[in-house]
């Protein structure tokens, strides 16, 4: 997970809780702070540092940054008085999480001195992941409670798969839990399920839902990790993995609730259109697509990016997405 200063602290807390509340919880959570954060965001992170006191390096970093006002007493900063009652008082969802599993989760916080963008932050996070299988997530989304369980069960039966995602439920608003988000869902982003379908789909559109993907760390690293490719860092990664004969799959199940507040505006404008052309040209130069495959979809995507926001929003929600 990667967080930067413009994100909502309540969304961050809800996202982390949706990870820690999984029916099959993770062994570790790696949170990359992409540059300096606001005091409110640092306060949320401090809550989890307090809940996982073995992460003493982060506690020291917080103390050196002068963040003692975020609810850390001197004893809390030393990591030796993380009592159950105090945790429940600071974060009521903690008691429910402990009912789900007694497994101890390791919580890593990695701080970058400057904001370098999502790709750079995720590459740094990869270095600190000790597990071969990594579940990705954005810090303003909500994972379905059984997301990891479903993905791991599938992967146990399909050992050849290197990256697995699934359906995303898109919603608008300030929901802080899956049940509330479900009532605000306006569309579903589905992706093809089999390798054969994905091999055809990847030439035209992104075949993997990045916010809910689970992938092999070694496969991502062997493909070069995330590389500079504005707006398309994840798509570019899947293309390079595909060229390296990686095996992909997607589940039909809804694995994640994704906030799309303002998404359609971000996918428009001249700069975005230029990035579309550059990325599609890269695919053509790398012989992933032919010129006949390059031209029609590139023209369509450029035209969509130059549409008025309201028209582009209608197109995404009514034509390019599965309706509720």
Label the predicted regions.
Residues 246, 258, 266-290:
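Catalytic core of nucleotide-sugar-dependent glycosyltransferases
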Residues 134:
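Short aromatic/hydrophobic "clamp" motif used to bind/position activated sugar donors
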Residues 146-184:
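Conserved donor NDP-sugar-binding/catalytic core segment of glycosyltransferases
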Residues 231-237:
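Acidic donor-binding loop at a coil-to-helix junction in glycosyltransferase catalytic cores
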Residues 111-129, 150:
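Glycine-rich, basic loop-to-helix element that forms the pyrophosphate-binding segment
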Residues 167, 248-255:
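Catalytic beta-strand/loop signature of glycosyltransferases that borders the donor
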Residues 7-21:
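Short, well-formed alpha-helical segments that are part of the catalytic scaffolds
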Residues 20-111:
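Acidic donor-binding segment of Leloir-type glycosyltransferases
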């Amino acid at each position: 997970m990667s967080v930067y200063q413009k994100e909502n602290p309540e969304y961050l807390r809800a996202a982390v809780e949706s990870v820690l509340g999984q029916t099959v919880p993770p062994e570790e959570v790696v949170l990359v702070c992409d540059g300096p954060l606001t005091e409110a965001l640092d306060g949320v992170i401090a809550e989890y540092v307090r809940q996982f006191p073995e992460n003493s390096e982060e506690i020291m970093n917080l103390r050196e940054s002068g963040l003692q006002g975020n609810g850390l007493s001197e004893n809390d900063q030393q990591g030796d008085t993380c009592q159950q009652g105090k945790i429940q008082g600071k974060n009521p969802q903690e008691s429910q999480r402990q009912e789900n599993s007694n497994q101890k989760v390791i919580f890593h916080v990695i701080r970058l001195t400057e904001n370098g963008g999502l790709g750079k932050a995720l590459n740094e996070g990869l270095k600190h992941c000790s597990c071969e299988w990594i579940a990705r997530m954005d810090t303003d989304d909500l994972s379905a409670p059984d997301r990891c369980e479903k993905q791991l069960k599938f992967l146990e039966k399909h050992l050849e798969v290197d990256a697995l995602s699934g359906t995303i439920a898109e919603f608008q608003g300030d929901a802080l839990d899956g049940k509330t988000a479900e009532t605000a869902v306006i569309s579903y982003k589905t992706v093809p399920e089999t390798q054969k379908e994905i091999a055809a789909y990847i030439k035209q559109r992104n075949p993997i839902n990045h916010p809910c993907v689970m992938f092999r760390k070694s496969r991502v690293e062997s493909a070069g990790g995330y590389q500079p490719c504005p707006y398309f860092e994840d798509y570019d990664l899947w293309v390079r993995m595909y060229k390296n004969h990686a095996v992909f799959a997607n589940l039909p199940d809804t694995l994640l609730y994704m906030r799309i507040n303002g998404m359609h505006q971000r996918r428009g404008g001249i700069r975005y259109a230029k990035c579309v052309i550059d990325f599609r040209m890269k695919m053509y130069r790398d012989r992933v697509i032919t010129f006949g495959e390059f031209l029609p979809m590139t023209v369509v995507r450029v035209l969509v990016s130059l549409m008025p926001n309201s028209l582009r929003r209608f197109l995404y929600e009514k034509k390019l997405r599965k309706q509720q």
